[in-house]
Amino acid sequence: MTAQIANGGYKIKPHIIYDKNINFENAQQKIAKQFINDSLLDNATTTDNYLVEREYQLYERLYKNSQNINFVKDAMFGSTNEQYGTSYKSRYENLKYQFAGKTGTSQVRRITEADRKLNLKQSQIKYENRDHALYIAFAPYKDPRYSISVLIEHGGSGSKAAAPLASKLIKKIIDRHDLREQTIKNNLTLA
């Protein structure tokens, strides 16, 4: 769903990407056969990077009014990049890594009146009774390529546990993408 928000509200048709750096050819073939025509696999080599061909079609918009999806995107941006946003501490000032996200916290059990009076912090509660921490995001904000969802069981709040982890993952993913692009560019200029 996060990817659908990032792309402006269009339904997404999943596809499989092969990467020559993955050494699990048999697993790839087995998984791929569930999704694509076997004849495409017969013509593919495991050492090449390629995108499995699929039929391009007009994707259906999820929302009739594009202002609605823009409102959600702006709210996710504010949640991460504005001073009082719930995941503000996890943001990057560098525009290259700027992302939009939303925190979430899920109760594991009912909180009793007696529990409320104790006013316990998550760290003071038995592990199995602590809240689950959630965070969804897409990045980079201006030109989204990635969406991420982080769930940490019994992690406490989304802003303290899940958002910082998502932030680190987003930075690593973008850096890896840039490194891959640079490697491809260098290989082409040497050839």
Per-region residue spans from a language model:
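A structural-propensity feature for long, helix-poor, extended segments
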Residues: 30-34, 57
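Hydrophobic/aromatic hotspots within intrinsically disordered, low-complexity regions
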Residues: 35, 40-41
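Alpha-helix boundary/capping detector
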Residues: 27-31, 174, 191
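Short, highly charged C-terminal tails/helix-capping segments
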Residues: 181-191
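Active-site beta-strand/loop architecture of penicillin-binding DD-peptidases
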Residues: 2-26, 41, 50-58, 67-180
